Amino acid sequence: MKRVCTLPLWLWLGIVSEADLVSSYSMTPPTLSITEEEHIINAKDTLTITCRGQHPLEWSWPGARWTPVEGRRRWNSQPQQRPVGAGNPEEDCEGTGTKPYCKVLVLTESQANDTGYYHCYYKYIDAKIEGTTAVSAYIFVRDFEQPFINKPETLLISKKENTWVPCLVSIPDLNVTLISQNSLIHPDRKTIFWDNKKGMQVPTQLIRDSLFVQCETVIDNKVFKSNFFIIHIAGIELYDIQLYPKKAMELLVGEKLVLNCTVWAEFNSGVRFQWTYPGKQMQRAVIESERRSLQTHTELSSILTLHNVSQQDLGRYTCTATNGAQMLEESTDVIVHEKPFINVEWRKGPVIEATAGDEAVKLPVKVVAYPQPDFQWYKAGKLIPKQSQSSMQIKDVAEHHAGTYTLVLRNRLVGLEKRISLQLIVNVPPRIHEKETSSPSIYSRRSPQALTCTVYGIPAPEVIQWQWRPWMPCRMFSRRSLNSRHRAARRHQRDRMPECKDWKDVSRQDAVNPIESIDTWVEFVEGRNKTVSKLAIQEANVSAMYKCIASNKVGRDERLIYFYVTTIPDGFEIESQPSEEPIEGQDLQLSCNADNYTYENLQWYRLNLSKLHDEEGNPLVLDCKNVHHYATKMQGELRFQPDSNDATLLLTIPNISLGEEGDYVCEVQNRKTREKHCHKKYISVQALEIPRLKQNLTDIWVNVSDSIEMRCKVDGNHVPDISWYKDEKLVEEVSGIDLADFNQRLSIQRVREEDAGLYLCSVCNAKGCVNSSASVSVEGSDDKTNVEIVILIGTGVIAVFFWILLIIIFCNIKRPAHADIKTGYLSIIMDPGEVPLEEQCAYLPYDSSKWEFPRDRLRLGKVLGHGAFGKVVEASAFGINKSNSCETVAAKMLKEGATASEQKALMSELKILIHIGNHLNVVNLLGACTKPNGPLMVIVEFCKYGNLSNYLRTKREGFSPYREKSPRLRIQVQSIVEAVRADRRSRSGTSDSAIFNRFLMHKSQTVQPIQEVDDLWQSPLTMEDLICYSFQVARGMEFLASRKCIHRDLAARNILLSENNVVKICDFGLARDIYKDPDYVRKGSARLPLKWMAPESIFDKVYTTQSDVWSFGVLLWEIFSLGASPYPGVQINEEFCQRFKDGTRMRAPEYTTAEIYRIMLSCWHGDPKERPTFSDLVEILGNLLQENVQQEGKDYIPLNDSHSSEDDGFSQVPSSAQQNSDEEDFDMRIRCHSLAARYYNCVSFPGCLTGGNQIRCSSRIKTFEEFPMTHTMYKAHPDNQTDSGMVLASEEFERIENRHRKEGGFSSKGPNRTAELSAEQSDLRGRCRPSYGSQVGGQTFYNSEYGELSEHSEDRSCTPPAEGASPPALHASFFSEQY
């Protein structure tokens, strides 16, 4: 702290402040016995002065503690020795009533030098002010022999205008003259004044050049002179003062304190230093002075040193420097600590908030410590370099700066350390991501649309507001009018943006386009939780402007959407009539349709083949900007459609020829950007040829009332003119006679005798004609027809009566609502003979706003597999998961030339996929492309590792039965199984879709995959993997069963392997109506997957969930044989089917365990009601998976290994598995210690039952390997045999079927199975499980021959779908063959 002021001002301020202080005491000043201001005594006289006052008093006289200040006096604080006389001249005296204190000053033998001011003041009051706390009198001690009383001294002359020469006299009325080196100076009372108490004041210039001056007076003609005053010219200006160190000084007890007070003064200046500090009374400090005279100024220093500081030395230290005319002052604080310490605390709390885009944010921390510690800042445990201060500043704040920051303070010398943490929250203004990508502004009329705004901000915006306004221009305004915060939040916007008014909130009641829904949800995209809002428009009818608004506490963002509705897709297209491949001689019309709001300047061109290459023959880069260089302009007719605001440029080419084939280009220009756009259409002209018939007509013999059909099939794409003649007369379409397929087909219903004759088919075009004829002969009489008509009429009347009766009955019965029909798979709820599958699919909805995916964002790749009517292609989908990422998918589509029924079947499969929903272990639907002008495609998940059967075969060499159990593996398996149990317990209140999503979240957040994706091919296959595959398939089948879906072809070839060892079920026969489609009736070369089919499916055509359980058992056999074909070495013939019916089963596969084989046998139970449900299998395999992971050492004991002891059981179940089964109702942990592991045929069927203190095992299971079959060869067509033996020749199967009919159908209680299925047998569930039959009710399909419903059929051989058949949907291998 520095103070600078002149000395008079300083004294005046001090006097005023002290006067104010003393006035508060309300005291009276002391009084003297001498009342006059000047008192004269002679030398040698005795001076006696009495002083009285209200407080203790003390005297001061010349030479002792006083300083004259312009008539007001102040005194030094330290008394000096009395300059004259001996002893103490002060004595106490008796006071009075009002002034009880009295002190008398007695001065004997007075001398001339005693002349001066005598002061009496209050002793214990620091403020000594004349007339208030002090009183004085000037005493002249007159001595005619010593009129002058001064001693030799130096007279400092400064830059002042006048200088006082202190010639003090003992006689008041003397005439004094000043003698300088050059002249005599007499007082003139103008510029030169004499004062008998101060001396003589003269102009400085009169004595400045003299070496000395002297005063002179004459008394009685005797001259007296004073001592010499040596003239010394000195500077009076003090430039600056500094006290080092500048900051407050902190020390520990015992340390050394050094303060340096330095003054920079004018050259040749004199300065007096004075220190004020707490220990000044005890004079603890050592003060040293230094002086350095430089060329331009003088540097003076006073150094205060204090050794071994203590607590008493703390306080304010002040250095005062004065030269008589000016005074400077500087202060500092000294803090003394007893011991080292560190104290740290927050300045603004533990949480600091900032906004992304701020220039800087400071993390303030208050630190009080000594000695100064080391500062280190950390974020998330990592040291932040170049941050060594107590408060850290972050510049250009961004989102990644958010987090927890920790300041660590260390004093390594004394071992002290303190930490403090601050949480920095960086708020991010909302940003709408769709603004960064180009979005379409043209929308097709009468089409459903979805407008989406994906917003990211911190904090996340709670609500995204949608507004709309009519389609009209908006005025533009500059972004510079926005405030700084908005500018930071909208850096990606253009400098000018539209400002539109008259906005209205979007609502279903007040909307120019009907609104279906407004949904808002939070989605995890690109590592961030983003808020997504979707405005679903039912039908785009009117052009409008939409705006979505997102805001949070630090900002706001909005997206303006120009919703222009047009009848032209994408605003620009080319159409050709009649087709893109016209026939030679036809009239071709090309239409260039463009939206008039967006485009203008329509122009047709035809590319010149000769100009498409340069001089060297290299192909030119075609660009729309220079299309006129290599194309010929063609004239068209421009038309406008006011109702749709569309422009059409028509190009008509009459009687097109082969030479006019080529590329035709339509060029348009964007009205806003002035950029040109082009569309190209290649016109392929087909040469006109003479028509050709694929086959000629053949003669027909038909009975009366039957129907006939004749086909005149023409080869080629162009169908010529076809005419039918009967007996040279033109046949026209009348009642009973139908012409279809461009007259290629002639149908006659209920043939009569007059329909007999010669029929001629004539096919003609401009090149010529070709004919084919056939004779139709009618047998029988028309009388029989009349009888049949009567019968039909009577039957119709009866049918109408019963139909009305049924309507009345059904009106009184509660029918299921339309919403109820949508909840299940309708072919399961309703009898398929009553309501065909295609009619049920008509009830299922297709939400294009949710599932439709643009074809232009789908890039097709290699073909993964072919089916009978379609193919599966690997594709890359951009943004299919509502993000900007690219994802590999599988696209399922029909082959070229697909019929309408095939497209309808694929659409039905799409609807049922949507109805079933998503599940982790099912190949899920991702989207679809159903809009016209492109192929129908169903987009599903892509599984990179192919089907499970091929994968298992490739991993045989690397199979490792066991591996070291890790805690991570145990935790993962426990988490997966517990998640499944929790989902199953909460299934009554939670949808499968919610369970699926929660399971995925649980898997991604808490469970690390067993194997990483890149290591799946390199990692060995283990027993845990096989059980995990089985568990996942059971879980997926449980989901399909809950959705009323029957697979009918469950096999390893239809199980796909995806990342993280996740398996997915595919080709669940969704859109196959095997009861109505004639293509599924068994024909000569039909292929049936007999090895995977249940007995009731083979012999009774019954497909249920329990028949899928049988197939699951065969799938288990495939998994634990590592992809081997079922029934190895067994020929599929009549003997196989007979033994199959009698209960013969497959032996245990090579790599299975006893527990797994018992599960297989329970799935192969002859009675479907006794088989476990998929829910039971999920519970059993989940328990087995946990036990397998928790075991120590080897947990795999193959059934084929031989043991040295008969007592070695093969059911290795740990004792820890024997727990209470109250929560786990279906426990599979059962031991069969009485069986040796090598006797695998002694495994109980279907399982072992623990009863009492002993374990009973039922009779053995016969296997095909134990009782070899007799090889019987049957003649069959070559295409009926495959390497896998999975099919059976139709003739042989017909013989088995006929025998089966004679025996009365398939039964689980055949004569040869009494011993195997005794009452003592039990399945895997044990005593605590309910009957499996309770899970099957209401899900069985019955065919028309053996079931409850009847259907007349002469063939009577309706079979399950065969691999070679032609279903309305894609074949079962459609998915599996892709991998």
UniProtKB/Swiss-Prot annotation:
UniProt modification remark: Autophosphorylated on tyrosine residues upon ligand binding. Autophosphorylation occurs in trans, i.e. one subunit of the dimeric receptor phosphorylates tyrosine residues on the other subunit.
Domain annotation Protein kinase: ranges: 858-1185
Recorded coiled-coil stretches: none
Activity control mechanisms: Present in an inactive conformation in the absence of bound ligand. Binding of VEGFC or VEGFD leads to dimerization and activation by autophosphorylation on tyrosine residues.
EC identifiers of the protein: 2.7.10.1
Keywords, in A-Z order: Angiogenesis, ATP-binding, Cell membrane, Cytoplasm, Differentiation, Disulfide bond, Glycoprotein, Immunoglobulin domain, Kinase, Membrane, Nucleotide-binding, Nucleus, Phosphoprotein, Receptor, Repeat, Signal, Transferase, Transmembrane, Transmembrane helix, Tyrosine-protein kinase
GO biological process: angiogenesis; cell differentiation; positive regulation of cell migration; protein autophosphorylation; regulation of MAPK cascade; vascular endothelial growth factor receptor signaling pathway; vascular endothelial growth factor signaling pathway
Glycosylation sites: 113, 175, 260, 308, 529, 541, 596, 608, 655, 696, 703, 771
The keyword Cytoplasm is annotated on this UniProt entry: yes
Disulfide bridge map: 51-120, 167-215, 261-319, 453-548, 474-500, 592-666, 712-761
Pfam families per record: I-set, Ig_3, Ig_VEGFR-1-like_5th, PK_Tyr_Ser-Thr, VEGFR-1-like_Ig-like, VEGFR-2_TMD
Composition-biased stretches (Polar residues): 1332-1343
Signal sequence residues: 1-19
Modified residues (Phosphotyrosine): 1075, 1080, 1239-1240, 1274, 1342, 1346
Membrane-side (Cytoplasmic) residue stretches: 810-1379
Binding site for ATP: 864-872, 892
Transmembrane region(s): 789-809
Domain of life: Eukaryota
Recorded GO CC terms: cytoplasm; nucleus; plasma membrane; receptor complex
A molecular function GO annotation: protein homodimerization activity
Subcellular location: Cell membrane; Cytoplasm; Nucleus
Domain notes: The first and second Ig-like C2-type (immunoglobulin-like) domains are sufficient for VEGFC binding. The fourth and fifth Ig-like C2-type (immunoglobulin-like) domains are sufficient for homodimerization. The fifth and seventh Ig-like C2-type (immunoglobulin-like) domains are required for autophosphorylation and further activation.
Family classification: Belongs to the protein kinase superfamily. Tyr protein kinase family. CSF-1/PDGF receptor subfamily.
Subunit structure: Interacts with VEGFC and VEGFD. Monomer in the absence of bound VEGFC or VEGFD. Homodimer in the presence of bound VEGFC or VEGFD.
Function: Tyrosine-protein kinase that acts as a cell-surface receptor for VEGFC and VEGFD, and plays an essential role in lymphangiogenesis and in the development of the vascular network and the cardiovascular system during embryonic development. Promotes proliferation, survival and migration of endothelial cells, and regulates angiogenic sprouting. Mediates activation of the MAPK1/ERK2, MAPK3/ERK1 signaling pathway, of MAPK8 and the JUN signaling pathway, and of the AKT1 signaling pathway.
Name recorded for this polypeptide: Vascular endothelial growth factor receptor 3
Native source species: Coturnix coturnix (Common quail)
Upper taxonomic lineage: Eukaryota, Metazoa, Chordata, Craniata, Vertebrata
